[in-house]
Amino acid sequence: VLSRRQRQMCIRDRYILMDGPLKNLLVVDLTRVLVGPYCTMILSDLGARVIKIEAPEIGDDSRKFGPFIKDYSAYFMSLNRGKESISLNLKNSDDKKIFDKILSKADILVENFKPGTLEKWGYGWKDICKKYPKLIYASASGFGQTGPLKELPAYDMVVQGMGGLMSVTGQPNSEPTRVGTSIGDITAGL
């Protein structure tokens, strides 16, 4: 049983989610871990309907990140609040039909796969803009879509080190120190 205050909070939160400034937008979320889910969480918080697409059996890597509450990752739940979710294998023709139906109604697609992955499945920028010309296509990758490092995976700590940020944190005469939060992912997610 919820207290009066808890009921008021639920009503307030539901109102905010339903009537935010992005309430008429549909976002397709093909993201995982932090940068993409953070971006789409903000869009959801602002009222957009967000449908998160996850690979069968694997899902978002962050489902395995602790701490856990009743077997669910608190990290995953916090970044994916307010979103709908469906499991689709984008290599499977039946699942592609479902995905295409979702895309046909969508306003925005957000993805953070390694460059070239969606192209292999027929959903790269060139394919999408021909089939869905009004769709906004947002892509985040650690080292960009072009250039010599595009194939490398990027985690925030690696980018902090490569960018020199770790050399100016921590104590004098100590090892390079990671900033306490994943500042690169969070900033890019904005």
Regions found by a protein language model. Name each.
Residues 15-190:
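N-terminal helix-loop segment corresponding to the beta1-alpha1 unit
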Residues 1-13:
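Single conserved hydrophobic/aromatic residue that forms the stacking wall/gate
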